Amino acid sequence: MMQQTSEIIQAPYLKRYYAPASTGNFSVGFDLLGAAFEPISGELFGDVLDIVAEQAELELELTGRYVHQLPADSSDNLVLSCFYAFEQTLGRSLPRLALRLHKNLPVGSGLGSSACSIVVACYAFNDYFGKPLSDNQLLQLMAQAEGGVSGSVHYDNVAPSFYGGLQLMLPDSAQLCRALPWFAHWRVVLCYPGTVLSTKAARAVLPKQLSLTLSIAFAGMLSRFVSALYSADEAEAVAALRDLVAEPARTPLLPELPALRAGLAELGVLHLGISGAGPTLFALCHNDAQAQLAAEYLARHYEKNQDATTQICRLSATGARAL
């Protein structure tokens, strides 16, 4: 059953901000590709942060569909740690704020939940306090905060959630990431089964080293995918969507994957992959009609409980923003 995910309570605020869900890796680009998505319904599928007021003490109220998955003590929250990290980066004291986080992404889902909270918080603080940090400085701050959660600094969730689009990470480049072309008719179905798989646990099963043969194959397949996007060769891009690094190690954690992939292939779905570290899966579809079939199939065969959600999405063009 496809359920509504966005729960935005009606309450006063000074400014309201939003950051979308994201899919890290996008199968072929482990730690190097990430895409931000938004439902075609217009629903907000991501976290919303309200700056409610300036006051004497920093305070955070938690609400939203997945608030029950967060630590009960709001002082142990990424939004507050981002405020202090932002303040430390500026090197000066900032006015304290009353904040409200609408947690509408599930935790440990493979949808960039921690990155989403980090991005919406850092974006909000930078905007509210007059944009003292450049986009590059802000993205670096986001990635450092994300590294504290996942165990390693990587940009493939924070970059797309911040900028939108399908982003290619650029190691050792001042630019950090670059938006890639995308096929406008593509739709992506995101299916979260309602179970939790922490990023740290999912990374723990990965190989510590890759053989020379596998390294060449990985680089070649990613190059093939990027080249196909720039050439607007859809068939070649789909053929290149092969996860040679993470999926072989993570499939034992997601035993339904092979059968679901076979079932969706019968419906003509272009590709089924693991969203980030999982357990969310993403189905790449050629159009809205195919996406509807894929969504119904995944909701029927992969959703496990009331926390589950299935969303038909398009690429998010804008990323984080004020509402």
Model-derived features with residue positions:
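ATP-binding N-lobe of GHMP and related small-molecule kinases
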Residues: M2-S109, Y123, D127, K131-L133, ...
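Short beta-strand segments
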Residues: Y18-P20, S161-Y163, L170, L190-G194, ...
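Beta-strand segments within the central parallel beta-sheet cores of soluble alpha/beta enzyme folds
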Residues: R96-L101, L133-A145, A239-L241
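Alpha/beta catalytic cores of group-transfer enzymes, especially the acyltransferase/condensing modules
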Residues: D135-W182, L272, F282
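Acyltransferase
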Residues: L180, A184-A262, E266-L267
